[in-house]
């Protein structure tokens, strides 16, 4: 069993990305991962908040880092936005002494300190690097044979630097998909932005970006899209009908989390994977891959 401090994040805990949180919980035992939820965690600092109050965002992020440092474990999150915000804060506090001094004052007011000893990691990287594809392959009871999948990395997972993949041409998610028996299709826009929170102030612009992604996946014969980010999943799933109306498209592409795809291949109950939470249903597409693993006695 591998142990980690776990930061669920607001979205995957009780927001639009709740299916990510539920499916994460559903696969950890099979992958021999022990995710110990960080006690008294707060919002990561939020990527939009960074642009309006950088110091405030850093202080919020640093509080989580200080709490995680007490555990002595790597801090793991399933949310790409949380991963980016926490990782960025960690990096800035290492690089800029003046900034760290200001943050230290905020932490001291809460009776905390951060020495800089936490390694922030995305759950996908933990599964890819620490669990490993060979181990995952050995656990597959539902090979996803014939399922054509567009691997969507989004714009944050492997940027600006990445220790486990090529930021210019990532392939790790494609490799994971292949290890589950599915077919990763060619997807030229695999690392393009989904529109992020632009759906609020600039909906038309965001819909254009979402349309480009969906159109690229559909034109390369994808049957579904798999992502590592709750914001990407929300945009591609929740706004797909709006894209249909605006651009007169006909495709209907389910958008799944990588944790859901893993769980399906490992024989986890579809209900436990929260497959019913999506707006674009994957039920018909995935009905052939629902053999459930026998309980271990």
State the predicted function of each range.
Residues 1-297:
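Iron-sulfur cluster-binding electron-transfer modules in prokaryotic oxidoreductases
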């Amino acid at each position: 069993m591998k142990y980690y401090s776990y930061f669920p994040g607001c979205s995957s805990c009780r927001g639009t990305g709740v299916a990510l949180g539920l499916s994460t919980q559903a696969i950890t035992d099979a992958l021999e991962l022990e995710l110990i939820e960080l006690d008294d965690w707060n919002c990561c600092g939020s990527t939009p908040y960074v642009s309006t109050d950088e110091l405030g965002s850093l202080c919020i992020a640093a509080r989580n880092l200080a709490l995680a440092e007490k555990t002595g474990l790597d801090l793991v999150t399933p949310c790409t936005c949380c991963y980016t915000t926490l990782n960025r804060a960690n990096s800035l506090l290492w690089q800029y002494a003046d900034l760290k001094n200001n943050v230290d004052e905020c932490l001291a007011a809460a009776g905390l300190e951060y020495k800089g000893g936490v390694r922030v990691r995305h759950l996908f990287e933990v599964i890819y690097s620490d669990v490993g594809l060979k181990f995952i392959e050995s656990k597959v009871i539902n090979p996803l044979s014939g399922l054509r999948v567009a691997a969507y990395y989004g714009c944050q997972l492997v940027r600006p630097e990445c220790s486990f993949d090529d930021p210019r041409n990532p392939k790790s998610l494609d490799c994971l998909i292949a290890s589950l028996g599915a077919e990763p299709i060619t997807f030229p826009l695999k690392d393009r932005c989904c529109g992020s929170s632009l759906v609020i102030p600039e909906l038309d612009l965001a819909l254009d970006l979402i349309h480009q992604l969906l159109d690229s996946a559909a034109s390369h014969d994808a049957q579904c899209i798999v992502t590592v980010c709750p914001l990407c999943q929300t945009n591609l799933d929740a706004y797909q009908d709006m894209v249909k109306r605006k651009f007169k498209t006909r495709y209907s592409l389910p958008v799944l989390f990588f944790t859901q795809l893993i769980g399906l291949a490992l024989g986890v109950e579809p209900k436990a994977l929260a497959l019913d939470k999506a707006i674009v249903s994957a039920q018909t597409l995935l009905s052939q891959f629902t053999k459930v693993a026998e309980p271990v006695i």
